[in-house]
Curated annotation (Swiss-Prot):
Name of a matching Pfam family: HTH_8
Listed Gene3D superfamilies: Homeodomain-like (1.10.10.60)
Identification of the protein by name: DNA-binding protein Fis
Known function: Activates ribosomal RNA transcription. Plays a direct role in upstream activation of rRNA promoters.
Family: Belongs to the transcriptional regulatory Fis family.
InterPro entries reported for this sequence: Fis_DNA-bd, Homeodomain-like_sf, HTH_Fis, Trans_regulatory_Fis
Statement: the UniProt record of this protein carries the keyword Transcription: yes
One term of GO molecular function: DNA-binding transcription factor activity
Assigned keywords, A-Z: Activator, DNA-binding, Transcription, Transcription regulation
DNA-binding region: 77-96
Subunit structure, as described in the record: Homodimer.
Amino acid sequence: MFDQTTNTEVHQLTVGKIETANGTIKPQLLRDAVKRAVTNFFAQLDGQEAQEVYEMVLSEVEAPLLDIIMQHTRGNQTRAANMLGINRGTLRKKLKKYGMN
């Protein structure tokens, strides 16, 4: 559903700001991309009722996010979990969910 775009983690990215070593990044571009993708999704429904949209959106965002972070950390789960702001056990559960373990 999304081009290159986790429950609490995504919420933090899209409505808050990301703290980096060099300062703060406001992820307006990510928010705009998600908004466009969800708008396009509903436009394509052609009057049909959508089911479980929340879970679908989260999984469509979470999977590529995890993939990119794991690449960035070269598979270091401790570093990845710290970057995401979640504990390593939660990260392992999410990686398993998406077949990335």
